[in-house]
Amino acid sequence: MAHDREVLRMIWEGQIGICFQADRDEIVGIKPEPFYLMISRLSYLPLVTDKVRKYFSRYISAEHQDGAVWFDFNGTPLRLHYPIGVLYDLLHPEEDSTPWCLTIHFSKFPEDMLVKLNSKELLESHYMSCLKEADVLKHRGLVISAMQKKDHNQLWLGLVNEKFDQFWAVNRRLMEPYGDLESFKNIPLRIYTDDDFTYTQKLISPISVGGQKKSLADLMAELSTPVRRAVGCRTHGIDLHEETQLQWMSEHLSYPDNFLHLSVDYKDV
C-alpha cells in the first residue's frame, strides 16, 4: 500500500525543545545553568538520560551520582516508558514557542509511580514487547514473527539514531494489511485523558459491521458513554479531523511502537 511519505516524514521530524534543570536540593556548590536539547517527539527520556546526566553530574553530590535518574514536570514524575511526544501532549497541551522545562533527579526514585528503566537494554525490551503486541492486534503476530533478529535490531537502531530510511525500510512491512486483506484486524490504540496519565486500551476494528471503513468520529462514538462524550482527539500535537479514517491514522500517525497514542477530550453529557 502506498504511504503518504511526506506525512511520515513530517511526523518523524517533529521535535520538542526541552530545558533541563537540576533538583536544587541535590546541587552541591554553584547552581548549574540549564541544559537545552531539541528532542524527537518519537524518542524516550531514557535515550537522552546519559547526555543530561553527564552535564549535571559535576554539580551533584557524590552520594547521588549513581542513583536511578528520573524527571518531573511541575512536580509530576514523567513515565520513562512513554514516548516524549505523548508526555508533552498530556502535560503541556497548549503549543507555544518556549522550551518545556523539566527537572532531573538523581535520588528518591518514585518506585510506586514509575517503571524503572535505567538502561537502554530495558527500554529496548519494552519497545519490542509493544511492537509484538501491536502486531498481534493488526496481523495476529504473523508479520513480526516472520522477521529476523536483524530486522528487529534495524527498527530499534533506526529509532535510537533517528534514521528515517533505516527505520521505515522495515516498519513499512508492519504498516501494511496482511496478505490480500485491505485493513488491519484491529487498531493498536492507547487512549489518554488529561486528568489521568495512565492509558486505556479498547479493541477497535477499522471496519464497521456493515463493511465500511471507520472514521475518527466512529471511534469517538465508541469511546463515549451515557455520562460523557468524546469531543476531540490529538496526537503529535495535532488536533485530528473527525473524518480521518482509522486505518489511515494507524498507518501514518502511529508512534514507532506501532500504537496510536491519542489524547482524548471529553465533555459531560
Swiss-Prot record:
GO terms for cellular component: Atg12-Atg5-Atg16 complex; autophagosome; cytoplasm; phagophore; phagophore assembly site membrane. There is a cross-link at residue 132 (Glycyl lysine isopeptide (Lys-Gly) (interchain with G-Cter in ATG12)). One of its GO terms (biological process) is phagosome-lysosome fusion. Keywords: Autophagy, Cytoplasm, Isopeptide bond, Membrane, Protein transport, Transport, Ubl conjugation. It is a peripheral membrane protein. Disulfide bonds: none annotated. Involved in autophagic vesicle formation. Conjugation with Atg12, through a ubiquitin-like conjugating system involving Atg7 as an E1-like activating enzyme and Atg10 as an E2-like conjugating enzyme, is essential for its function. The Atg12-Atg5 conjugate acts as an E3-like enzyme which is required for lipidation of Atg8 and its association to the vesicle membranes. Belongs to the ATG5 family. This is Autophagy protein 5. It comes from Drosophila melanogaster (Fruit fly).
